[in-house]
Amino acid sequence: MKIFYKAINMTLSMFTVIPSPKYEWDDRAAKHIMKLYPFIGLIIGALWYLSFFVLSKLNVPIMLMAALILTVPYILTGFLHLDGFMDVSDALLSRRDKETKLRILKDSTVGAFSVISVVLLLLVEFAGMFTVLNKNLDMRVLIFIPIASRAINGYFIVSQEMLGQSSLAKFFKEGTGKVDEIILLGIYVLVALITFFTLGINYLIAILAMGLISFILLLKVKKELGGINGDVAGYILVLMEFTGILLLGII
């Protein structure tokens, strides 16, 4: 139980800016981190929905509310995944050979493609969030989106080949196996079912679309880069949540 509690706090401190007790790195606890990744999604989702609830009670104008709500998951994660999105976008959009793309991915310099990509992402995501609010949809969906995205993301991390000597391969993949994969996929399926029975078919479509786009992106990244790492995982997660918001605005 102590190891599990330590794993929760390690996961919180690693993937969010939410204050939590600090622990020395523990390999026994580390093998549970990916299984707990969806739990981080639950916390982020609950705070995401809470931000909507508070802003709506304050009668904040919809356009401003959309902008503020949009920033919540990025702020809670310290822009960790958005950074990965920018790095991978820079590499993939360069249209260079595989070796050059990998070199660009490792380069800390902010490239033009990464800037263009993040600006377009946030503009379209803002439009999607504004539309969702304008349609008076059930915003409890904000709780489920981060759980679903992290369940699939965690599954990819424990099941897919890593790029080089990735820190993810060392810290998260070691000690995991088929049981972890089944648990993470099971959580995604459970979230989809709960979404359907509590919110309805349109919300389920958004959750399923997130899963579909994640596998499409995985195939693309594996083809062009050869595997995944932390940046790639962040890239996929950001676009999964983007897809969820966009689909809710469209359907």
Swiss-Prot record:
GO terms for biological process: cobalamin biosynthetic process. The chain crosses the membrane at residues 36-56, 60-80, 110-130, 141-161, 181-201, 202-222, 231-251. Its cofactor is Mg(2+). It is an enzyme of class 2 (transferase). Its main location: membrane. It is found in: Cell membrane. One of its GO terms (molecular function) is adenosylcobinamide-GDP ribazoletransferase activity. InterPro entries: CobS (IPR003805). It catalyses: alpha-ribazole + adenosylcob(III)inamide-GDP = adenosylcob(III)alamin + GMP + H(+); alpha-ribazole 5'-phosphate + adenosylcob(III)inamide-GDP = adenosylcob(III)alamin 5'-phosphate + GMP + H(+). Its EC number is 2.7.8.26. It is a multi-pass membrane protein. It comes from the Bacteria. GO terms for cellular component: plasma membrane. Keywords: Cell membrane, Cobalamin biosynthesis, Magnesium, Membrane, Transferase, Transmembrane, Transmembrane helix. Pathway: Cofactor biosynthesis; adenosylcobalamin biosynthesis; adenosylcobalamin from cob(II)yrinate a,c-diamide: step 7/7. Joins adenosylcobinamide-GDP and alpha-ribazole to generate adenosylcobalamin (Ado-cobalamin). Also synthesizes adenosylcobalamin 5'-phosphate from adenosylcobinamide-GDP and alpha-ribazole 5'-phosphate. Belongs to the CobS family. This is Adenosylcobinamide-GDP ribazoletransferase.
